[in-house]
Amino acid sequence: FKDGKITLVANAQQIKLAKDAYNTTIDATGKHVYPGFIVPNSTLGLVEIDAVKSSDDEEEIGTFNPNVRSIVAYTADSKVIETVRPNGILMAQITPRGGRVSGSSSIVQLDAWHWKEALIKENDGIHINLPATFRRGGWWAEPGSIEPNKEYNKQLQEINAFFKSSKAYLGGTSDSRNLVTEATKGLFDGTQTLFIHADEEKQIVDGIQLALENGIKKIVIVGGFEAYKAAPLLLKNNIGVLLRRIHDLPTNEDQDIDLPYKMAKILTDKGILVGLENSGSKERMSSRNLPFLAGTCVAYGLDKEKALQLITLNTAKLLGIDQQCGSLEEGKDATLFIS
């Protein structure tokens, strides 16, 4: 590669290069060359120390915050980032948290001193969090019973009303500016993706229908534990899934204990584009475990090459950066490593 771009991908046994063709030659005999792994839906660089409030920038106050841009709060020289790169994590989608509409994420490469030089794709999508259909009472030491969320339909309609009002504003001729609704423009003109954070089947179906009714075409499900139940709808609308952390327990007591480990293969076999994400407890430091999540998918039946794509090319496609990275191809960024 030269100037950060891959210039040649070929079989070394079939071609011969001049010794001075490249400034540096690396002997990788017996090793593998991998495209950089991508961790989506990440808060890397947004929080340094959980107990120090001044270093926590992952969440903004308010319910509808599409105008919140995570990239301006991203700390490129975070000490946590230094611990994930040795495991091949070279890119991340920096994603805000909280509210119904959390804000806009951006995609960065992790070898930088400032967010501007780290940028791969700015404001790639807007993230919404759908309300749960069921809730458990009590607290962690004394869990209560599971009960239906009586406010579910009302909360869903609030999201729907927000998008309808945003669309109306963008199509109007008002002289007054509304920065909150202006921030949703990319969803309606196709330049941004709507990332719907949902695990339950009803959440997923309702979220997709809500988006389609408002003219939003580029959709990705984040979490998607029960996405396999909505596979026909996902396939019909070309919607992929950033699958929740698979090193976890099932969400329901009557589910197969190994279901989280099998989920990537189940969705892949159904023809759904799947990537892996790692949000949850200790998500920033445990981002380094992303390749092990892919390894678990292999142990539960997925082909090794397809498992690798879960954290490289598939994720790049879901984030809209596959023309730039995600695989080893001529013309793409030389964001890679040898192991």
Regions found by a protein language model. Name each.
Residues 1-34:
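Histidine-rich, glycine-flanked metal-binding segment
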Residues 18, 36-37, 119, 230-232, ...:
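Short, charged, surface-exposed secondary-structure boundary motifs
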Residues 28-87, 92-95:
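Metal-associated gating/positioning segment near the N- to mid-region
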Residues 50, 55-61, 67, 193, ...:
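His/Asp/Glu-enriched, well-ordered alpha-helical/loop segment
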Residues 87-218:
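Polyanionic/metal-chelating signatures
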Residues 195-199, 218-226, 246, 250-251:
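Catalytic beta/alpha-barrel core
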Residues 211-218, 235-242, 271-273:
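Glycine-enriched alpha-helix->loop->beta-strand junction motifs that scaffold or abut catalytic
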Residues 226-236:
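Active-site-adjacent beta->alpha loops and helix N-cap segments on the catalytic face
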